[in-house]
Amino acid sequence: MADTTPEPSGHLIVHSDTHSDTVLASLEDQRKKGFLCDITLIVENVHFRAHKALLAASSEYFSMMFAEEGEIGQSIYMLEGMVADTFGILLEFIYTGYLHASEKMTEQILATAQFLKVYDLVKAYTDFQNSHNSPKPPALNCSGTPVVVISNKKNDPLKRKRGRPRKTNSLQEGKSELAAEGEVQLRVNNSVQNRQNFVFKEDSVRLNEQTPKEKELEPAGEPGSVEEMPAEKDENSDPKARDGPGSQSRYSKRRTRRSVKLKDYKLSGDEDDQSTAKRATCGRQKRSSAPEARCKDCDRVFKYSHFLAIHQRRHTGERPFKCSECGKGFAQKHSLQVHTRMHTGERPYTCTVCSKALTTKHSLLEHMSLHSGQKSFTCDQCGKYFSQKRQLKSHYRVHTGHSLPECNHCHRKFMDVSQLKKHLRTHTGEKPFTCEICGKSFTAKSSLQTHIRIHRGEKPYSCSICGKCFSDSSAKRRHCVLHTGKKPFSCPECSLQFARLDNLKAHLKIHSKEKHASDSSSVSGSSADEVRNVLQLQPYQLSASGEQEIQLLVTDSVHNINFMPTPSQGVSIVAAESSQNMATDPAANITLLTQQPEQLQGLILSAQQEQTEHIQSLGMIGSQMDTSQTEPVHVITLSKETLEHLHAHQEQTSSSVPAADTGARASSPPSTRPGAELTQAPLTVPLDPSPGATVGGVALWAVLL
C-alpha cells in the first residue's frame, strides 16, 4: 500500500508501506544463500554469515566494532559468552523483524539483545508483555501457540508483503512436533512511527523453520550418497543456483559450517513415510522434490542438476574457464577467480586476530582454527578431530586403504599431491619463483617471500628473551631452542644429543656414509673429503695457480661459526686438527682453508649475537663486505655439535698416523693442486704480532701462502 500526498508546488510524495519489508526479505534471502555476505560470526563453533551494513544498523555493538575495524573486506569474528541457538534467533529477528522462540528462551534472548544493544527487540518485547496482560486472549495456532503481531497500523488486517520469507497458512492435518513447547512470535515494523498498537490475527499460524535434524548423510563415493559441491560460493553468480548455508563434507560433518538455519533435504525412498508425515504439519509445506540428479559414471547423487553438471567435468576433463595470464584451465568459475588472485596479489579475507590476509574464505577459516585451537574437522569413521581439512583427508586414507603420495626419487610420503609437487622440485632443480630485485630463484613461493624481506630489511619475528629479530618464523623457532638449553634429539648410533632436529638428520647422514665407506673397501676417500661430505659443502676446487689462502683456527668455546666468503672465493678443504679431548683442550680447532684468485677482500667471520664480542673481522685483509653487492653469498655454518663430531672423526683417522709425522706436517705447506687431499697441516702464525693472540678466548689464526 502506498500513500500519496499532494504538495502545493504540484509535486507528489509517494510513500510505500511495503518497501522496508521487501528490502528486509531480500536481505534475509541473501543471507540464507550466502550471497554478498561480508562477515562471518562464530558462536560455539557455529558459523553465521551476515551483512555488516544491516548488523551495524540494527546493533550499536556491531556498529562500534565495525567502525574500529575499518575497511578490510571479508572478516570473521568469534563471539564469546553466547549460545549459538540464542544468537541465531536474534540474527533472524534482525533480518525479518520477527522473534520466534519458546517462552523459556526469551530471558536469554533478551540478555543477548541487551548486550548487543539491539534495542528494537528489547522495546518490542516490553510492549508485547504490556499488551499480553490485557484480558483479550490471543489466538492459538494448531499447537496451542499464541501468535502476536505487532504493527504500526490501527485495525488493518495484516497483508502479505511481496518477498516476505514466511507466510501464514490455515490449519493442516497432522500434529506438530513443536506442540510440546509454547511458542511466541513477535513481528516488529522497524519504521520510525509509533509501535504501541497491537492486532491479534486469529487465523495465522507459523512453522518453526528449524525442522528436526534428519538422518546424517552417508560418506560420499558410495552409491546412493549425497554430495554437494565443495566450491566456495561465487558472489557474482546467479543467486538461484546457490545452495543453503550448510553442506556436508566429503569425509565428515564439519562443525564450524553448521548453521541454525540449516535445512536438510531428502531423497525419495531414503526414509520411511512417517518422517514425511511429521513434516506435513501446520505452516507452509515444502515444495515437491526435484528429480534425482545422479552421475552416470560414479553413481553419486547431487542436490541440484547444476552441481551435477559441474561434477561431470571431472570425468570429461572439460575446463571451460581459462586464465588470461597463464592460460591454465579450470572446471569452475570460482576456481578461476581464486587462481587469478595469485597473479593480482589480492587477498580479500583478513584475520581479525593477527591481520593476516588470505585469498579464500576456506583458508581463512582454517587459519582462525589455529588461533582458537579448535579442531573443526571430524573423521566419520573413528571420530578423530583435525584442525585442517587436508589433515583429515590424509587421515582418511587409513580407513580407505589408499596410500599417501610418495616421491619416486627418495620414497618420502606426503599428506597431499600439492606437497609432493613442491618436494619434486628439490630433485628436478626447478625454481619457478624468481626475485625481481636480484634474480635469485626459489622452489617455493614462501621462500621467495622470506627472501624479499631480506631486501626490504623486514624482520617481523623477534625473540621474546633476547630481542633478536628474524625475517623467517622458522629461524626464530630454531633460535628460541638455544635459550632453553635442551637437546631433545638423540642419535641412536652414538647417543650424541642435538637441540634441533635438522642437525640430528644431518648427523645421521654421517653414520650412513661411514657405513657405506666401510662396506666399500675398494673405494677410499681422504679425511678432508669425508669431512666435506659431513658439512654438505659445495665441491669448490683450489685454483691451479695457487693463489693466497687463509686458515682460521677457532676453539670450541664458540657454538656456531658462520664463514661468509665473497663470490670470488671458494671453500676448498675443511678438516679437523687432532686433539685428544675437545671439551677440555682449548687447542682443539677447525681449519677452514679458502682460496681466491685475486686479493682477499670482504672476508667476514661472524657468530651469534651474544658471541659477537668474541669474533673479529680479519682486519688485515678488509673487514666489511660491500653492502651493495647483489651476487649470492655462500654461508657455511659450523655448529658445536659438528665440531664435536669432527673431532671424534679426526681421532679415528689420526690413530693411523705416526706421532713423528705430526711434527713433520707442521713444517711444510699444504698442496694447492686442484682436488688435493689434506695430508699436511699448514704453518700458522697469529694475526696479532704478539704470540698466541686470542680475542675473548677465541683464537684467530691466519696464514698467507
UniProtKB/Swiss-Prot annotation:
<comment type="function">
    <text>May be involved in BMP2-induced transcription.</text>
</comment>
<dbReference type="Pfam" id="PF00096">
    <property type="entry name" value="zf-C2H2"/>
</dbReference>
<keyword id="KW-0677">Repeat</keyword>
<feature type="compositionally biased region" description="Basic and acidic residues">
    <location>
        <begin position="203"/>
        <end position="218"/>
    </location>
</feature>
<dbReference type="GO" id="GO:0005654">
    <property type="term" value="C:nucleoplasm"/>
</dbReference>
<feature type="zinc finger region" description="C2H2-type 8">
    <location>
        <begin position="489"/>
        <end position="511"/>
    </location>
</feature>
<feature type="region of interest" description="Disordered">
    <location>
        <begin position="151"/>
        <end position="178"/>
    </location>
</feature>
<feature type="compositionally biased region" description="Basic and acidic residues">
    <location>
        <begin position="230"/>
        <end position="243"/>
    </location>
</feature>
<feature type="zinc finger region" description="C2H2-type 7">
    <location>
        <begin position="461"/>
        <end position="483"/>
    </location>
</feature>
<keyword id="KW-0238">DNA-binding</keyword>
<dbReference type="GO" id="GO:0000978">
    <property type="term" value="F:RNA polymerase II cis-regulatory region sequence-specific DNA binding"/>
</dbReference>
<protein>
    <recommendedName>
        <fullName>Zinc finger and BTB domain-containing protein 24</fullName>
    </recommendedName>
</protein>
<feature type="zinc finger region" description="C2H2-type 1">
    <location>
        <begin position="293"/>
        <end position="315"/>
    </location>
</feature>
<keyword id="KW-0862">Zinc</keyword>
<dbReference type="Pfam" id="PF00651">
    <property type="entry name" value="BTB"/>
</dbReference>
<dbReference type="InterPro" id="IPR036236">
    <property type="entry name" value="Znf_C2H2_sf"/>
</dbReference>
<feature type="zinc finger region" description="C2H2-type 3">
    <location>
        <begin position="349"/>
        <end position="371"/>
    </location>
</feature>
<comment type="similarity">
    <text>Belongs to the krueppel C2H2-type zinc-finger protein family.</text>
</comment>
<feature type="domain" description="BTB">
    <location>
        <begin position="37"/>
        <end position="103"/>
    </location>
</feature>
<feature type="DNA-binding region" description="A.T hook">
    <location>
        <begin position="159"/>
        <end position="171"/>
    </location>
</feature>
<comment type="subunit">
    <text>Interacts with MN1.</text>
</comment>
<dbReference type="GO" id="GO:0001227">
    <property type="term" value="F:DNA-binding transcription repressor activity, RNA polymerase II-specific"/>
</dbReference>
<keyword id="KW-0863">Zinc-finger</keyword>
<feature type="zinc finger region" description="C2H2-type 6">
    <location>
        <begin position="433"/>
        <end position="455"/>
    </location>
</feature>
<feature type="zinc finger region" description="C2H2-type 4">
    <location>
        <begin position="377"/>
        <end position="399"/>
    </location>
</feature>
<dbReference type="GO" id="GO:0003700">
    <property type="term" value="F:DNA-binding transcription factor activity"/>
</dbReference>
<keyword id="KW-0804">Transcription</keyword>
<dbReference type="GO" id="GO:0008270">
    <property type="term" value="F:zinc ion binding"/>
</dbReference>
<feature type="zinc finger region" description="C2H2-type 2">
    <location>
        <begin position="321"/>
        <end position="343"/>
    </location>
</feature>
<dbReference type="GO" id="GO:0002244">
    <property type="term" value="P:hematopoietic progenitor cell differentiation"/>
</dbReference>
<feature type="compositionally biased region" description="Basic residues">
    <location>
        <begin position="251"/>
        <end position="260"/>
    </location>
</feature>
<dbReference type="InterPro" id="IPR011333">
    <property type="entry name" value="SKP1/BTB/POZ_sf"/>
</dbReference>
<keyword id="KW-0479">Metal-binding</keyword>
<keyword id="KW-0539">Nucleus</keyword>
<feature type="zinc finger region" description="C2H2-type 5">
    <location>
        <begin position="405"/>
        <end position="427"/>
    </location>
</feature>
<feature type="region of interest" description="Disordered">
    <location>
        <begin position="203"/>
        <end position="286"/>
    </location>
</feature>
<dbReference type="GO" id="GO:0001817">
    <property type="term" value="P:regulation of cytokine production"/>
</dbReference>
<dbReference type="GO" id="GO:0002682">
    <property type="term" value="P:regulation of immune system process"/>
</dbReference>
<keyword id="KW-0805">Transcription regulation</keyword>
<dbReference type="GO" id="GO:0006355">
    <property type="term" value="P:regulation of DNA-templated transcription"/>
</dbReference>
<feature type="region of interest" description="Disordered">
    <location>
        <begin position="646"/>
        <end position="691"/>
    </location>
</feature>
<dbReference type="InterPro" id="IPR013087">
    <property type="entry name" value="Znf_C2H2_type"/>
</dbReference>
